[in-house]
Amino acid sequence: METANDKTNVQGIKEDPELILINISGADRPGVTAALTAILAQYDAMVLDIGQADIHHTLSLGILFRTTSSVSGEIMKDLLFKAYDLQVKI
């Protein structure tokens, strides 16, 4: 049974939707959230919720997003590399 969330890619392969929650922690600096959400935008991931706390210049950030199974691995790979560059942990 197909639902409104089911998508078919250009090759005609059905893509399953995935909800992913990532938790980011580390030193808070300008641009961390922007850099990570820019990656989500590159893959047309839909950000569903963001929660953030900054305690004594330490960032705790949670991002819930929806994507498809065909690109979720690539998104996570790119997020992990960017997190390494930004010196934060996912």
Identify what each model region corresponds to.
Residues 2-90:
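A conserved regulatory-domain signal marking ACT and ACT-like small-molecule sensing domains
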